Amino acid sequence: MVRVALLNWEEAEPVAAPLRFAIFVKAQQTDGIELDERDKDCLHAVAYDDAGKVIGTARMLPDGQIGRMAVVEEWRRRGVGAALLEALIAAARERGYKDVSLTVPLQAAEFYRNQGFVAEGKVHQAGGVLQQAMRKAL
């Protein structure tokens, strides 16, 4: 069973930052910009397993943009990403947002389509990765 907590950055940083570093910088070898000054303004979703181990995280900016989705490899395709999205989307609805948006690597677009997101605009390249902007009406 997966439990998702919605946290501010002060609460989330000790667990979300190391997970994002492990997934984005070490495993995916990105440029290390997975933490930024916007984290403090975001709502953070953190997923835990039954033992209390952090297995996933994502964030939502005040404008409804979701990003920094990271799930531990052995927990992928087990509903963790969907649970993180559901928690952030529920929070967006409570805040009266009309929609949420995100930009994802092209190979992940199918997952987000299955969660009700629709592609917006053309595929573009960022950091050497093909990306797709997507939006979901609430």
Give the positions of each predicted feature.
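Conserved beta-strand in the GNAT
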Residues: 46, 52-70
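Conserved GNAT acetyl-CoA-binding A-motif
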Residues: 92-105
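Conserved active-site tyrosine of GNAT-family acetyltransferases
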Residues: 20, 112, 117
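Short beta-strand micro-motifs in enzyme catalytic cores
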Residues: 41-45, 67, 130-134
